Amino acid sequence: VAAQQVLKHQRDMLEAAQAAYELGQRMVTVGNWSKLQLSPVQLAASNARMNLRRAQQAAAQAQANLVKTMGQTGLQDGFALPDQLPAIPVQPMTAAELQKRAEAVRSHLPDAESLRNRALSKSAMNVYWAAHALAQDSQGDILKTREFITEETVLHYNGMLKSVWDLLDEVRNQSQATVDAIGAQRDFWIAETDLQWVLQGGEPDSFVSLGGVGGDTPAAAGH
């Protein structure tokens, strides 16, 4: 789901970068710009194309992994994905709540497994809380501020107070902020899944690495 969401916004960024490059080419043709001035715009368009290709590959790989998983569990027929990830909870689970659940699980485990679960629970909780904080920040102040800047840029452009370059740059910035927010949201739900697994006695090989934006961050082994 996250990979498909990211793919859409990578297309938006490429469209804006390509529009800027085409405008720059016209300015070079009529003599208003030099090729040196065009070069950064050309690089931005090339980078946007590369990012789109990465996003396309990530989306295809995520789809293939999902089909494989559904096939292994006998659910390959008739499943459908939502258009977007669910919203993160306003408040994360508390330390007291999680400790109570963790202790209940450990009381049923052999001593060696109980010790491993204690360490895993601490790590899983820390990643969970960090992922929640990052997702809140990226979807809260950061994204809202970027949306405000975009709206103001459009108004200034319509009033001829901003250039088309300013507008195209802001479209790219807005799309990138959205991609980052989707990545943080995805990371939270992976961290939450890892935590729930540990609280059932599971032992993931690793936890999600926070900060990826491409939709292809692997879940812990065993999911």
Give each language-model segment a name.
Residues 74, 114-117, 121, 180-223:
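Acidic, low-complexity, intrinsically disordered peripheral segments
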Residues 13, 19-20, 27, 34, ...:
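Soluble, cytosolic/nucleoplasmic coiled-coil alpha-helices used as oligomeric scaffolds and tethers
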Residues 35, 75, 163-164, 205:
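Short, electropositive, low-hydrophobicity segments enriched in small/polar residues
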Residues 2, 47-72, 145-201:
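Short segments within alpha-helical structural elements
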